[in-house]
Amino acid sequence: MDTLSSAKNIWDFLKINQDITKSDLILVLGNSDIRTVDKAVELYKKNYANKIIITGGLGRISSDLFDEPEAVVFKNIAVQKGVKDLDIEIESNSTNTFDNFRFTKKMIDDSKVNVKSIIIVTKPYMEKRAYLMAKEIFHNTNLAVTSPDIEFSNYPNQILNKDFVINMLVGEVQRLIIYASQSEIEQIKIPKDILQNYNYLMQKGYIKQLL
């Protein structure tokens, strides 16, 4: 067992790799990685949906990178890349994932628009948790989650370096365990080898993104 193979195993576990189909809405979860909104723009241009909601205020990580809420930063990028301004709405007050979904659900309900299907766009390693959380908020809605098409080995960059990403992977597994124990998401079986990788990485000091 080593650090990179352990991280790669967790990365693969956290991704869902769902097939996506045309939907009523693309919901973008704001975060520190602008590649997320690039994926949303790609889906919009391929006509998977003609409306986008971007959700996200200034989170604990993005506040060190952005001067404006995540949703504002992402919207500006989307418009620059060709998305019509009128096709984008933003929610810029949420600072955690549950509130991303709760506040967006209220926006949709208040608009009286009948949204039956949503494509959620997030970071690759957040696919599983995002899907489980969304299911708790968007009842009777067809949900699918997707993310930028990037493998673990190519994901780190100058802003989000390898150590940061590995810390985030460990934090994701911990959140799945804690939120399920608190009945905030449904219980899922975490394979034994993933738990071994998780514990190994914590022993190696990758604990900066733990709750």
Task: Tell what function each PLM region has.
Residues 160-211:
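A conserved mid-domain beta-alpha-beta active-site/ligand-binding segment of alpha/beta enzyme cores
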Residues 1-169, 210:
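A structural signal for short, hydrophobic/glycine-enriched beta-strand patches
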